[in-house]
Amino acid sequence: MHLSKASFLFDCSRFILNFHERCLKNGVRTKKACVICRSKKQKCDGQLPCLYCKKYEYQCAYEGQATSTCNSEASLFNDANFKIGSDYRSKRIKVVSDTNNNKEDGDGKLSFTQCNPRMDIHHEAENFTAMVPYYEPKKFRFFYENSAIVFPRIYVFIYFEEVHPIFSMFDQKAMEKKIQFLWDNKSTDSCSEYVVISVKGKLVEHITQVLESSLSTTILSSIQLTVCWVLRTIYLHATTRPHLSWIASSVSMHYAEIVGLHQEITAEYGTRGIELTNITTQMVEEDGPAYQLVLLFKIIMEYQIISEDSRFVYLQAFQRLDQLCDIHSPALVLLKATVCFHLYRNLFLARIKPFCVIVSILFSVIDRALESCKQLVSQRKAW
C-alpha cells in the first residue's frame, strides 16, 4: 500500500514536471495573455516577460502593467556611466581652423574625422547632434558651416599637388588671390560673372544637343562632333567610372577615324591643315615632370605602325620606357603603365609574340603602378 502511494506521488510529480516543460516549450493560452501574444494570436505562458517575447526580443507588457524590455543591451543605455557626446566631440578633428585664413597648412590640407561609432535606436534623440561627424563618408558630402570653403579646397589641393606639376597651366598664388577677392567681395556688381555663366550655360546646352543628335543615323560626322565626344571623354574620365569613359573614348576614336583625322591626306575629307603661328609655349626643362610627359607622348607617336619588324621595334619602345625610371609623380607612373598597356595591346592584336624582356618590363611597370595607386589611396587623392 505504501509502495503504491509512493509510486502514485512519483507519477504525479513527473506528470506535473512534464506538463510544465510542455508549457514552457509550446506555451498555453491564458486569459491574461500579454499584448504582443494577443495581437499576434500566439500562446502565452503568463510570465513577465513571456517565452514568446523572450524568443523574438519583443517588449512584453500586460494591460495595466509596466513595459518590460527583453533586450539585454537596454540596460547599457540606462546606465549613468554611458555618456556619448562630450567624449566623442573631444575626439573630433577640426577641418578648418580659421575660415578667413587662405593659407593652407604644410602637413595636410584636410583632416578627416575618425570613424563614427554605431548609434543604436535606444539612444536618446538629443545626443544625435553630438554623434554626427563633420564628414559623412557614405554620402560623400560635408554638412556644416564651412562646407562651401572646405569642399572646393580639396579639389584645388589635388590639382596643384598632382596635375599642376605636369601641365603648369595656372598660377597658384594668383588663383588663390582671385578666389579670396571674389569670396570677400560683398557687392552685387558682378555683371562679368553673370555673362560668363550664361555663355557657359549656352555652350553646355549646345554640346548636349550635338551629343544627343549624334545618336541619329542621319547626322553626318564632323570635326565638331569629334571634339564634343573628346570633351565628353575627358569629363567622364575625371568624374565617373572607368568603363563609361572607355565607351566615350571608343566613340570619339571612331568618329576621328570616320572624319579622317588619323590620315595625313585630310584634304580629301573636306578638311584643311591648321598652322599654329601663335605658339608662345616655352621649352620645358629636362628634369621636370613636363619633359617626362613629352617623352611618353613621343614614344606613343613613334611606335604606332605595325610591320614585319614590329617585334624588334616594340622591344626598343619598351626599353625606352624602362629607361624612364626617374619618374616620381604617381600620375606619371600611371600614365607610363597606360602607355605600356597600349603598346602591348597592339602586339596582341597583331598576333605577334613578344620577347620575354617585354613581359618582364611590363610586370615591373605594373608593380610600380600598383605602388602609386596605394600611395594615392592612402592620401585619399583621385587619379
Swiss-Prot record:
Q: Sum up the protein's function in the record's words.
A: Probable transcriptional repressor of multidrug resistance genes.
Which key words are in the record?
A: DNA-binding, Metal-binding, Nucleus, Transcription, Transcription regulation, Zinc
GO molecular-function annotation terms? Answer: DNA-binding transcription factor activity, RNA polymerase II-specific; RNA polymerase II cis-regulatory region sequence-specific DNA binding; zinc ion binding
DNA-binding region per Swiss-Prot/TrEMBL record: 34-60
Q: Which GO terms describe its cellular component?
A: nucleus
Q: Which domain of life is it from?
A: Eukaryota
Tell me which Gene3D superfamilies the record gives: Zn(2)-C6 fungal-type DNA-binding domain (4.10.240.10)
Q: Does the keyword Cell membrane apply?
A: no
GO process terms (BP): positive regulation of transcription by RNA polymerase II
* Protein name, as recorded: Probable transcriptional repressor C1348.12
What is its subcellular localisation? Answer: Nucleus
Main subcellular location of this protein, as a coarse class: nucleus
- PROSITE patterns cross-referenced by the UniProt entry: ZN2_CY6_FUNGAL_1, ZN2_CY6_FUNGAL_2
Entry-linked PANTHER family: 2-NITROPROPANE DIOXYGENASE FAMILY, PUTATIVE (AFU_ORTHOLOGUE AFUA_2G17430)-RELATED, SNOAL-LIKE DOMAIN-CONTAINING PROTEIN
The record ties this protein, via SUPFAM superfamilies, to: Zn2/Cys6 DNA-binding domain (SSF57701)
